[in-house]
Amino acid sequence: MSYSRRAILSLALAGCVIGGVAMAGESASFTPAGFEAAQKAGKPILVEITAPWCPTCRAQAPILNELCSEPRFKNLQVFAVDFDSQKDALLAVRAQRQSTLIVFKGATEVGRSVGDTSKASVEALLAKTL
């Protein structure tokens, strides 16, 4: 069976559109410089420790996507840390496990949770950045 280039590209594009939920806040991979700049700017920050094989992380993703798209979290700077490949970032934020969520108000850590998949408590955690 052969597929046209157009059909393959259409499917790939549809997968990107359906699979990706845009967050209102800025999202970036964790870098020490980016994290420090956000802290110095006094931004509300979420550091999300994830792993592609982690079922709890997969359960947290739609909750975070929904909450981060709310207008009150529009200025939230989200830094994603890959548990397997960014060990230096884990040390920087003193995280020991995947599915860890850490929130900051500027340079001050204001909350942390590990393995939380309750929308209400994740929302309460993010609200601490406001």
Language-model segments: which ranges?
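Typically the conserved alpha-helix immediately C-terminal to a functionally engaged Cys/Sec
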Residues: 58-72
